[in-house]
Amino acid sequence: MFHRIEEALEDLKQGKVVIVCDDENRENEGDFIALAEYITPETINFMITHGRGLVCVPITEGYAERLQLEPMVSHNTDSHHTAFTVSIDHVSTTTGISAHERATTIQQLLNPASKGADFNRPGHIFPLIAKEGGVLRRAGHTEAAVDLAQLCGAEPAGVICEIINEDGTMARVPDLLQCAKQFDIKMITIEDLIAYRRHHETLVTREVEITLPTDFGTFQAIGYSNSLDTKEHIALVKGDISTGEPVLVRVHSECLTGDVFGSCRCDCGPQLHAALAQIEREGKGVLLYMRQEGRGIGLLNKLRAYKLQEEGFDTVEANEKLGFPADLRDYGIGAQILKDLGLQHLRLLTNNPRKIAGLQGYDLTVTERVPLQMPAKEENKTYLQTKVNKLGHLLNL
């Protein structure tokens, strides 16, 4: 049904367009993608005629800095945190909207001699800043476009356009397959691109391994660094996890207030302890402790969110009030650590369906969701109910 990544790369190198699909539990859409280096008015016209979506240009942070492309908004509350910059037109264009002038703007964006002053703001081309690390960090079309360009040896920038059906609905896989057949276009998935990159590179390094006796039992503690940021993560491993059988796994995001101080605002501490105890009872398993404080927003911002909750906002509203998505965690680094440990099939201790989708997008298989529900307390009843109502957590309250 889908083509190999190598086939798509060959077409992209020839200036052709490919279709890239993301996870059905994410945006569940397909985009036309081309290399910005080879963009032509004809390609732009094809995209806007048959794609019907917004034409955007994924770029690296370096392009944005060189051309002084500021974020479109100061607080990005998009559910997928797509990093739009201010839109632009090259100063040589007139209205900037024609296929020819949009292609001109893209070509000049890549021109190493271009400066920030060479572009009018706002305009008709929408640059998007890809996360460093690409789809291994964030499984989005923005990162896929830049990754594909880099794998082709081209300038690290792409041109993308969402594919919309003639009736105005989003094109899903059956529609995209028909489109690919109609125009003889290669079609790939971000999941396959992740798998392709994983075979060629890694972002995590196993640094040190020790024996760690705990109140719950004795574990092997393995420390990891990663090349994306300065965060250090730790995996607590129990028993022989190399048998190929599904392994009990808990991916636990750091919560200083709950894990260390016993905060009753959340259920993180009890979940951590219960997971360790359950892994000990099983005789084998992994607890992966990720330094993603406050669902990824950091300790101080989590405390600021708590302050807003004291003023009547719920946990999701507080994050959004601070300019963050409800959940800023990404699972790419965690997935790489689990893969480094030799895991493929997981019995995942979680109440969060998004965590399952997040890990499965990185070539891991969740064979079973193992509930990890803690008794609610008066102080966290509202918090837990919000996680059910707004974040889709599976809890019986």
Swiss-Prot record:
The UniProt entry annotates the active site at: D327, R329
Give the record's pathway: Cofactor biosynthesis; riboflavin biosynthesis; 2-hydroxy-3-oxobutyl phosphate from D-ribulose 5-phosphate: step 1/1; Cofactor biosynthesis; riboflavin biosynthesis; 5-amino-6-(D-ribitylamino)uracil from GTP: step 1/4
- Annotated residues that bind Zn(2+) are located at C255, C266, C268
Q: Which cofactor does it need?
A: Mg(2+); Mn(2+); Zn(2+)
- Task of the protein: Catalyzes the conversion of D-ribulose 5-phosphate to formate and 3,4-dihydroxy-2-butanone 4-phosphate.
UniProt: D-ribulose 5-phosphate binding residues: R26, E27, D31, R138, A139, G140, H141, T142, E162
Q: What is its EC number?
A: 4.1.99.12, 3.5.4.25
The entry's Mg(2+) 2-binding residues are E27, H141
Which reaction is this enzyme known to catalyze? D-ribulose 5-phosphate = (2S)-2-hydroxy-3-oxobutyl phosphate + formate + H(+); GTP + 4 H2O = 2,5-diamino-6-hydroxy-4-(5-phosphoribosylamino)-pyrimidine + formate + 2 phosphate + 3 H(+)
**Protein name from the UniProt record:** Riboflavin biosynthesis protein RibBA
Annotated region described as GTP cyclohydrolase II, given as residue ranges: 200-397
Annotated site residues (Essential for DHBP synthase activity) in this chain: H124, E162
Q: Which residues bind Mg(2+) 1?
A: E27
Region of interest (DHBP synthase), ranges: 1-199
The record's section on InterPro entries has: DHBP_synth_RibB-like_a/b_dom, DHBP_synthase_RibB, GTP_cyclohydro_II, RibA, RibA-like_sf, Riboflavin_synth_RibBA
User: Family assignment?
Assistant: In the N-terminal section; belongs to the DHBP synthase family.
Alphabetically sorted, this entry's keywords are:
GTP-binding, Hydrolase, Lyase, Magnesium, Manganese, Metal-binding, Multifunctional enzyme, Nucleotide-binding, Riboflavin biosynthesis, Zinc
- The organism named in the record is Bacillus anthracis
- UniProt superkingdom: Bacteria
User: What does the cofactor section's free text say about binding?
Assistant: Binds 2 divalent metal cations per subunit. Magnesium or manganese.
Q: Where does GTP bind?
A: R250, V251, H252, S253, E254, Q271, E293, G294, R295, T315, T350, K355
Entry's Gene Ontology BP terms: riboflavin biosynthetic process
